[in-house]
């Protein structure tokens, strides 16, 4: 058990911050798609079109990743709709 714990810690040390942030972005898209009852790809395209990933999720990673999943998804949906309506 202790050896497995050490192996897991070593793997986690090798994961870069960028990989962690990208996994968070993927989780944001997936959770938003689930809440909207639509596909991951559709939500990704909508977010990309309005710059939500580059201009909201990535720059705000630190505060966003500490939110509960429910609050995070509600914020993302609200932001997505508001930004789309500005176009």
Question: What do these predicted regions represent?
Answer:
Residues 7-40:
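N-terminal acidic leader/helix
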Residues 9, 13, 42-45, 65, ...:
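General helical secondary-structure elements
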Residues 18, 30, 45-46, 54-55, ...:
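Intrinsically disordered, low-complexity, basic-enriched segments
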Residues 33-35, 39-64:
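Amphipathic, hydrophobic secondary-structure cores in small proteins
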């Amino acid at each position: 058990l202790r050896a497995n714990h050490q192996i897991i810690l070593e793997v986690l040390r090798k994961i870069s911050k960028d990989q962690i942030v990208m996994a968070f972005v993927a989780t944001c898209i997936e959770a938003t798609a689930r809440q909207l009852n639509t596909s991951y790809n559709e939500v990704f395209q909508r977010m990309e079109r309005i710059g939500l990933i580059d201009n909201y999720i990535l720059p705000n990673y630190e505060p966003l990743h500490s939110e509960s999943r429910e609050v995070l998804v509600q914020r993302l949906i609200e932001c997505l709709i508001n930004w789309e309506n500005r176009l």
